[in-house]
Amino acid sequence: MVTIDLITGFLGSGKTTFLKKYAEYLMDQGLHIGILENDFGAINVDMLMLHELRGDQCELEMIAGGCDAESHRRRFRTKLISMRMCGYDRVLVEPSGIYDVDEFFDVLREEPLDQWYEIGNVIAILDARLENNLSQQADYLLASEAANAGKVILSHADVATREQCEDTVAHLNRALEQIRCDRRIDPKKDILQKNLTDLTKEDLEEVSKCGYRLESYRKMDLENGQSFDSLFFMEEKIKPEALERAVPRLFSDKSCGEVFRIKGFVKNGAGQWMELNATPDSHTMQSVAVGQEVLIVIGEHLQEDKIREILKEEETCQS
């Protein structure tokens, strides 16, 4: 049977960064792996971010979002059936930061997938600097993605204080209580607290054997509530410098809505692709070999006109 791992994490927690390290570790062990990417929205930016992993030992597959839950479930099942024919030793599933974890378990219980795949690990990535004031829907996602995790990795721990790390674990346990889940995260047993880029071979070996839990909790219907939005800005022709100025405004200006994450690609003056990855606490802009002219803004109650207005203002602003 093919071992399949699920890697979850709320928006901007660092799932893709972790996935790169984890995939490299597995390939170093001689494994042939398949990575199944699922993004929240119709365009899968994370596929481009993982482009460098593609090679003889690693293939990338994708399921685009932008559809209803039942259609997405069918796509997931169909993709797993086709990936079974590829001879992978392990499949890594990285869903979007907005994901119904039950879909993973439910689909893998169906025939013939239950005869082809065995669940190895459920790994949850959580930003150690978690925002205290999250909506009820965001807290639900946070708790549901961690409830069944064999290991919770506190990312960005190198720039978080001890108090922030403790508050984040306490917040997670409150969120678990709110959804009537009996599990409580034990910082000593369940948490790996480390900067993702500093994970060692020993750390990754531990994570690769962490397993998973099967917990029950009260479900919330996120689809009908339309809690989260994703907006796509195609071919905005905005320069990296202007985007750097716009990003803090988009997070701080509440007339834009509650922005959780901004990611995408723009070209600099030399024609080089630049990758943006931003959360309210930090953002990076770095050169990459492959890109697509698109910005994706993810959050709650987003106001497209206001966001577009800020992008245009910064592009026309003389620095």
List PLM regions with ranges:
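A short, charged/proline- and glycine-enriched loop
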Residues: M1-V2, G291-Q292
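Nucleotide-state-sensitive switch-loop elements of NTP-binding domains
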Residues: V2-T8, S13-S135, Y140
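C-terminal accessory "lid"/substrate-recognition subdomains
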Residues: A42, N148-K151, V159-G291, L302-D305, ...
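Short glycine-rich or small-residue beta-strand-to-loop segments that form or flank ligand, phosphate
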Residues: L92-V93, K151-L154
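Short, amphipathic alpha-helical segments
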Residues: P95-I98, Q136-A143, A147, V159-E166
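A short alpha->loop->secondary-structure connector
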Residues: E111-Y117, L142-S144, V169-Q178
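Internal, well-ordered alpha/beta segment that forms a basic, Gly-enriched binding/recognition surface
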Residues: A124, S155-D158
